[in-house]
Structure formats: C-alpha cells, structure tokens
Amino acid sequence: MKSDMKNSWTGWFFMALILLSGCTNTPKQEAMYATTPHTNQRLPRNLPKKMFGIALQLPADFNSYKQGEHFLWLSNNDTEVVENIALYSIKENAISALNVPRFCHLRDSVMHKNVRGISDAIYMTTLQASVRGWKDNTTSTFWFEGLWEMQNDAMGGRFICRAIKRPSRHDILFAEAILYAPKTENKTILMRQLQTVLQSIK
C-alpha cells in the first residue's frame, strides 16, 4: 500500500522532494523548489499569527517552513518520522458547502500548487475514498481525516484537518497535520499528538 511504504530510501527521497529547502542549503534542493516560494531561515514563531492571525503550540523541533500565498508549511524535518503542519485559508464565499467531496477538491487544489516534487507531475493529492468528515457541534469547526499520496510517486501517509469558519475574516482556515512515517507500525499515537497541535489554535 502506498500509504505504508517501508523503504528508507523512499523516506529520504520524500524529504528531498517535498520538504523545505530550509532544511539544507544544497543547490540541488534549491532547484527542486524553484516553482514554489521557500526560505532557508528558521521558523519565526510569530509567523502563523502574522499570516493567519492565530497562535498555536508547536513542538520544539518544528523549525523548518515553506511560505506561499495564503499557505504555510511547517515541519520537524526528521529523517524517520516526518511530522508536518500545513496552514491555508480560503475565502468563505468561495465555499458553498464543506462536505467531503468539496473538501478534497479544495485540498487538492492547494496541495497541487504548494506541495510538489522534482517535476510538476509529482504533487500531493487526497485519497477521497479514505476521507471521513464530521462537525464539532460546539464550535464552527469541521474535521476531516484520511490518506494522502504523491501523484505519480510511491509515497503517502495519513492526515487530519481542522477547518475553522472565521466570520470576522470572511474565510475558512484549514490546519492540517500530515504524517510520513513508513517505518512506524502504530501511527495512531503520532496522529493524536499532532491533532493536539491543531486543537491548540486560538
């Protein structure tokens, strides 16, 4: 199964293709990210607030990032268990209903633009059949979880997304935890730890 690839080389390759040029400064990686905005600097802890008006409790090892238009990718840049948080916002008037098919369409459009491999033919996509969604009845929050994969490549994993309607900003903020841990048998604990990061958003 693509979501459970156990090849250590694949893990390194995923890092080289998808993660942040801020993790290393090699000319090869610079070329890989020529199509998307990127940075070689350490993560400013106030960047989520500056971009999206939010605060969240990130693990101490989240130091790498990639910044795009209304998009922020944060990572621990680990070599074995790659944990990522993606933040992006979409204007509310562009969303008529937030159900699973609509969410997958929106997610795929954002990831296709911001999370690519060495060529434009390699990009992150959502396995819609794996996705389930539910609403938190106490807040204006929707949750979605499922599997992601790299189109035209053998990499994948699990994700969970918190979608927050923000009437004051006339948008919906999407906060995702994205895991790539092919050598880890029980990924549930890792996903729940990442989910607490999403729940810390204020």
Language-model features: where?
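Terminus-proximal functional modules
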Residues: 21-40, 48-50, 69, 109, ...
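Secretory pathway targeting signatures of secreted, lumenal, and periplasmic proteins
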Residues: 59-116
